[in-house]
């Protein structure tokens, strides 16, 4: 195998596929390179995730063939090469990257050790989605996933497709994030769970282009995601997602507020800065909200925050404690310029409502 490719395109391709290694376990670090008359394909496959990307422009395939090598090492070597075109060639058990006045050598691995790119099994539910919207929906809920691996359901994002509606949900026991969008009628009714770690690895592959589309396919145990140049095969999380709907109160809120998002984010940013490292028991430090005609925000920590915010307030006075760290993540993902919050009492959840998004935050106990 011998190819000539621009360094920029090579590094970009390797950064795309490196996410397919080590998600949810210790996978062997293998990169498979396949060159033929249609271009060059780079592929990594792990236990839970496989990624492949194809480069068809600004390259020359001088000798078709295929080989495998260490992906991380290949990316390191490519990054060290001078700008411009790079020749990649295999000779016996060595893989050379060459440019003017520079040649670096890596090792070739055994192709038999490369796991196959797994196809879907069972009935396939296939739909096309706007790339920008799909990426933004995942981004807006991903922060609410549980970070550990011991609870696969809670560390996953739940996808629900109901004909012309797509909804994604994530929760971690302290917060819930829900994002919903209307799409063209699909005739599809399906749901699945995908680990947050998998979504984090593939999120950079989804174009941030409102004019482009992605194909999302749900199978029995796996999903596929396809763009113009990339293809992802990932494992679905088994089991059932939590019945999160029952966490939403079925009564009217004690008080509703509407406040400017930018102003509230600035205040909560200062409260998050004030957080002290937990001394024992990981007891969260609350930001105290005194809600009456205005909102008084108080936080004691590295610094003391004491601010009064103008807001539209409807309901009874309320004093409640909220984690500023959790609130900061919710405010960042909230898609509108004005935030509407519903409070159901000092010991009940707080619901952030919007046209296409909904977030829930559990309060922190405070002294009266």
Regions found by a protein language model. Name each.
Residues 1-368:
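Structural preference for solvent-exposed beta-strand-turn elements
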